[in-house]
């Protein structure tokens, strides 16, 4: 039969195979066609990495199925896995290994079934389908292994109608898992469910234990509104388009509706609401868009440009961007290239730290401009700010925060505009563009806040 293999460059290779061929055989056929050694090939089907010893039929690969080919980074590395008993296991891995692969390696060494393993890195629970490089796990990183509790617990879910559903769960279940269990019982699709506990809306990727949900806790289930509403989209020409939508529609859905009405491809559309560029994967309700809200439609400029990003190690990365890309988009492109999560990236241009919601054109960043990438230190800290009245304010900050950021945090707490604030540490007035670490301000340091006289010079 014929199957297709799609590479990251978008090229599609056609192979003649049999259901009984092993994945290893398939890799050899790819080598014959493309010259890529099997040990550099990773084949993905239905989101799963295929193992050499298995056959196509094991994975239910049928004629004209499409596999995805990802190249392994050359050369493996060692990582460590620390258990709760304090034992440390050493594993040989590659950056391209999935978390699932790592769990299998742990099973081979320790005999612990993958479904009883939870792996934690940098305080985050790692998802099976992601790779080590997705989480920026590098050589000699240490993961923490927590065993899932065997034997679950009961929790209750109360609906708006007053009905109570009982669920069997484990502390390590994600909110997504819980929604699936509710769907199994009640038939309500997960994307129509919002779960509330202790007044907080629960996020899909988090676990019950993250929210300290214990046995016999009660969650509240709110349905996302079915039943639509009208919103307006205003173009730069002044034309207003009316759309029928639902709160649960994604921004991507909205762009498709605009395409249906106006013929503008989604990838040329930027939607703005309350000064913010809206992200495709988010829903209207995420942005608190209500009936008769007005969005603004800006067209992306066709034809991109190249910019450079220089890291502290001196490495320069080249990115394909558009002037209308947000800083957030740029950070995602850097993550795709370098594996550094956006929340660990700080981008600097012309001495200024760039804000996620702004675009390249907002900062007048043009073709072949160079941005500087500084990594945020993981993990925040507390500092104190003492006012002349003797009041002490506590702030959550990171060493990589600029003085400007700190002043904004003070404004959020105290309502004092940044331009009226002077911050003093160790007898020195602190400059807006510098970071806390530039001044060696460490956890529990105390800054002094002096108010500028109005109309000063």
From Swiss-Prot:
InterPro entries: Ubiquitin-like_dom, Ubiquitin-like_domsf, Ubiquitin_CS, Ubiquitin_dom, Ubiquitin_ubiquitin-like
Signal peptide: none
The keyword Cytoplasm appears for this protein: yes
Keywords: Cytoplasm, Isopeptide bond, Nucleus, Repeat, Ubl conjugation
Presence of the UniProt keyword Ribonucleoprotein in the record: no
Major place of residence: cytoplasm
Domain of life: Eukaryota
Covalent cross-link Glycyl lysine isopeptide (Gly-Lys) (interchain with K-? in acceptor proteins) as placed by the record, residue numbers: 76
SUPFAM superfamilies membership: Ubiquitin-like (SSF54236)
Other comment: For the sake of clarity sequence features are annotated only for the first chain, and are not repeated for each of the following chains.
Protein known as: Polyubiquitin
Source species of the chain: Aglaothamnion neglectum (Red alga)
């Amino acid at each position: 039969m014929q199957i297709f293999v799609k590479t990251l460059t978008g090229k599609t290779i056609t192979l003649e195979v049999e259901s009984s061929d092993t994945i290893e055989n398939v890799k050899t056929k790819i080598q014959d066609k493309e010259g890529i050694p099997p040990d550099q090939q990773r084949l993905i089907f239905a989101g799963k990495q295929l193992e050499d010893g298995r056959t196509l039929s094991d994975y239910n690969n049928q004629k004209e199925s499409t596999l995805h080919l990802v190249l392994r980074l050359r050369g493996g590395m060692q990582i460590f896995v620390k258990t709760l008993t304090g034992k440390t296991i050493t594993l040989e891995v590659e950056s391209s290994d999935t978390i699932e692969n790592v769990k299998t390696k742990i099973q081979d060494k320790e005999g612990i079934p993958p479904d009883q393993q939870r792996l934690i890195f940098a305080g985050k629970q790692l998802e099976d389908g992601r790779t080590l490089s997705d989480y920026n796990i590098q050589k000699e990183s240490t993961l923490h292994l927590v065993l899932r509790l065997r034997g679950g617990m009961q929790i209750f879910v109360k609906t708006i109608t007053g009905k109570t559903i009982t669920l069997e769960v484990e502390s390590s279940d994600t909110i997504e898992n819980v929604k699936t269990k509710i769907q199994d019982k009640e038939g309500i699709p997960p994307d129509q469910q919002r779960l509330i506990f202790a007044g907080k809306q629960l996020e899909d990727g988090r676990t019950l234990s993250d929210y300290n949900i214990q046995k016999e806790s009660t969650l509240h289930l709110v349905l996302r509104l079915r039943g639509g509403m009208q919103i307006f989209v205003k173009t730069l020409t002044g034309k207003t388009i009316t759309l029928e939508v639902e709160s649960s529609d994604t921004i991507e859905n909205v762009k498709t509706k605009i395409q249906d009405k106006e013929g503008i491809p989604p990838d040329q559309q930027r939607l703005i609401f309350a000064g913010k560029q809206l992200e495709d994967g988010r829903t209207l309700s995420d942005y608190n868009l209500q009936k008769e809200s007005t969005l603004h439609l800006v067209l992306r400029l066709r034809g991109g440009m190249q910019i450079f990003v220089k890291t502290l190690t001196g490495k320069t990365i080249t990115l394909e961007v558009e002037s209308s890309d947000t800083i957030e988009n740029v950070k995602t492109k850097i993550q795709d290239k370098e594996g550094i999560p956006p929340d660990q990236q700080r981008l600097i241009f012309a001495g200024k730290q760039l804000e996620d919601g702004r675009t390249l054109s907002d900062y007048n960043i043009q073709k072949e401009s160079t941005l500087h990438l500084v990594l945020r230190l993981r993990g925040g800290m507390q500092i104190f700010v003492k006012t002349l009245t003797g009041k002490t304010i506590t702030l959550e900050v990171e060493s990589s925060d600029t003085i400007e950021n700190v002043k904004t945090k003070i404004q959020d707490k105290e309502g004092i505009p940044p331009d009226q604030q002077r911050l003093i540490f160790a007898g020195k007035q602190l400059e807006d563009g510098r970071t806390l670490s530039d001044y060696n301000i460490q956890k529990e340091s105390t800054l002094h806040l002096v108010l500028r006289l109005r109309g000063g010079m």
